[in-house]
Amino acid sequence: MSMFCYQCQEAAGGRGCTVKGVCGKTEDIAKTQDLIIYVVKGIAIYSSQAREMGLNTSEADKFIVESLFSTITNANFDAKALNARVQKGLKIRQSLKDAIIKAGGSYNSKENKSWTSKFLSVLGIKNDKDEKEIHDAAVWAANNPEDFKKKAETVGVLATENEDIRSLRELLTYGLKGMAAYLEHANNLGYDEDSIHAFMEKALVATLDDTLSADELTALVLECGKYGVDVMALLDKANTSTYGNPEITKVNIGVRNNPGILISGHDLKDMEELLKQTEGTGVDVYTHSEMLPANYYPAFKKYKHFVGNYGNAWWKQNEEFEAFNGPILMTTNCIVTPKASYKDRMYTTGVTGFEGVKHINTSKDGKKDFSEIIEHAKRCTSPKEIEKGEIIGGFAHNQVLALAPQVVDAVKTGAIKRFFVMAGCDGRMKSRNYYTDFAKALPKDTVILTAGCAKYKYNKLDLGDINGIPRVLDAGQCNDSYSLAVIALKLKEVFELEDINELPISYNIAWYEQKAVIVLLALLHLGVKNIHLGPTLPAFLSPNVAKILVENFGIGTISSVDEDIKMFMN
């Protein structure tokens, strides 16, 4: 069976990638990632039961989060690292199984189905009835890449034959991948929430359950949105408690004459470590793409060698990384297949990886040693200037709520007629120029609320302000879509409205990968309706599942700029 992947917006032909991923991943990488998900589901079978028995599941919890994150679009292309993850997962699954058997395999639960009997079956004492109750994901075993490869042939997306069940299972899985990304960042800062892990494991197990109906899976998808809100709130708390609340900031987009390191991705802990270790070395630090919002946090402003932001959204990195001249640190997705001209200057860390690119590991005490990349930078010339000037951002919920009197007054007087939430992702497709044209064509009495790399389609346009309020308010990274939800809920309260959809807010969101999926599900959980997704609807939505979203939540797509603005403003 050839590869099949349709988890991102650029799925080939709007259906799925079957030969090679548009993202650049090969068939082998795609299938190994499928196998990682299968292993994670097997672990979840045991960890969810171990949790109910009061056993320690921290190792499994961490592994599940990291593994889901590692399979997100443009995160990891390193076959060796991915195969090692499969191997490690099987060991963790076995240790959980052993712990449950040792504990007696019995616990108080209405769903208790004689775990002692099940594990006797696992150990070779077969009972036909019990044998059927254990899913293959919990029992299959292998110990080398060749056997992994054979197994991967059988466990991909298309292993679920029913189109609608497959669609719901994948929608749920992609929501979990986005959730895992946010939970990983919170965990790195010392913040966690057991209920989120418990839900993730419950949901993973549910994707293996052939007895669940489409309605039951739909309910789980919507429940996923609830935990999406929880995980974004947790990450917001982690970021702001550690680094302070983002504040209005003018960010330099030019360069200096010192050698520099370019840091891309989302992990603020990595940002902090890099700034600390480069201080006093003569090496400057620049953010790239989704790391831009690091410029808004008070804790990072004390570093005089933190220059600003270099470049644009992730998909332009081939030309921008080449021009930067210094080393690049990828803390998370999005990685584009590197050109030979800079591949030896590229470093990955965390769950990211690319074959032939140096990887910086985390030590046992949770620290990272960036000395190699710092010494590398010292041997490089300073970055080539590709633009200059400033952009403004830092409008997360705390900052916007501080401006609430101005904003409310502007709405009441009619100076602001409507807000447009244009959060989400950027991408390569030319059809995404729609978002630049849309921003330019919006009436002058409207304000754009944004988060994520979608902002790069319009954050350098001169769209002016309304009574001193910039017409583009950037809350931060994609997870800071949480801020936009907090702002909307506060405005609902201020204007004494019963329904969030009564606010003068329209949602025109550009999506690309799985973090956008969890943001969408979170918004649906909060009751937001009539969200428009573009530039295309997800390939993983079957016609029937798409119909559910349209009929129950008013999900729509985009058409032309003029038609859409007319529709939104009426």
Swiss-Prot record:
InterPro entries: HCP/CODH, Hydroxylam_reduct, Prismane-like_a/b-sand, Prismane-like_sf, Prismane_a-bundle. Belongs to the HCP family. Its main location: cytoplasm. It holds the Pfam family Prismane. This is Hydroxylamine reductase. The lineage of its organism: Bacteria, Bacillati, Bacillota, Clostridia, Eubacteriales. One of its GO terms (biological process) is response to hydrogen peroxide. Its cofactor is [4Fe-4S] cluster; hybrid [4Fe-2O-2S] cluster.
